């Protein structure tokens, strides 16, 4: 088996319940890299927040590249390269939010390692605390002046079926977006061209590595296409 790269999701896979990487895992990563195998992170988190957490997770200096925001970002530490692909327009984000405005949920957009939300509640507070990320409550009419990589809907896990059901009624003839349950409490909207596998394929191609030469680990629906 010609494995030239290993990639791993963050939450529920790479991190323990204490929000660190186990010492045995770190040792395995270092051993693989010593043999010339690249180690990357493929996550729904944005690339900035991953970079900001390397030290606290205990993997500083162990990462070669990050595929962030579900596949729309590539942050390559070897090539010192960053690129962002496929965003959602401000008008589309507003329309999506309006579609769920009467429901028990909140919305958030992660930008430059910070979670931005239109209101303060337990949903955004718990998410920020769990991920160890700063959050800010802002006026989204003012905030949404540029495209963003994705919009996240936060809700109670028991309420997720209702969010998914409502999503089936969302239609827009001018814009396209795809949506996916990424954790028990997160429902995410992204450009339909975005997926972890497409982002990973592009990141690997920068090093002339094929998908068949990559071993991937994950635990959620958006990790499945990486493992096919």
Outline where the language-model segments fall:
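Asp-based phosphoryl-transfer active-site loop
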Residues: 2-19, 227
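Short loop/turn microsegments at loop-to-beta-strand junctions
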Residues: 2-4, 62-63, 217
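Hydrophobic packing within well-folded, soluble alpha/beta domains
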Residues: 6, 29-32, 39, 200, ...
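Residue-level marker for buried hydrophobic side chains located in beta-strands
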Residues: 6-8, 67, 216
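Conserved Rossmann-like nucleotide-cofactor binding loop
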Residues: 13, 47, 222
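Active-site phosphate-binding/coordination module
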Residues: 23-123
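Short active-site oxyanion
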Residues: 36-40, 64, 150, 212-213, ...
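Conserved acidic, metal-coordinating active-site core of Asp-based
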Residues: 99, 103-226
């Amino acid at each position: 088996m010609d494995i030239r790269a290993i990639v791993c999701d963050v939450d529920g896979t790479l991190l323990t319940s204490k929000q660190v990487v186990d010492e045995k895992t770190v040792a395995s990563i270092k051993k693989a890299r010593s043999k010339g195998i690249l180690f990357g992170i493929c996550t729904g988190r944005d690339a900035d927040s991953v970079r900001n957490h390397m030290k606290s997770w205990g993997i500083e200096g162990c990462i070669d590249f990050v595929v962030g925001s579900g596949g729309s970002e590539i942050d390559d530490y070897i090539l010192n390269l960053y690129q962002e692909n496929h965003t959602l327009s401000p008008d589309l984000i507003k329309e999506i939010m309006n579609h769920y405005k009467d429901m028990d949920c909140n919305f958030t957009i992660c930008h430059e390692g910070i979670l931005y939300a239109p209101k303060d509640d337990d949903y955004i507070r718990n998410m920020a605390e769990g991920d160890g990320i700063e959050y800010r409550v802002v006026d989204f009419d003012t905030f949404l002046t540029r495209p963003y990589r994705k919009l996240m809907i936060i809700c109670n896990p028991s309420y997720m079926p209702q969010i998914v059901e409502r999503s089936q009624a969302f239609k827009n003839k001018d814009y396209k977006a795809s949506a996916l349950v990424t954790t028990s409490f997160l429902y995410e909207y992204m450009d339909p061209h975005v997926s972890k596998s497409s982002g990973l394929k592009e990141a690997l191609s920068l090093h002339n590595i094929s998908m068949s030469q990559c071993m991937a680990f994950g635990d959620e629906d958006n990790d499945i296409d990486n493992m096919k």
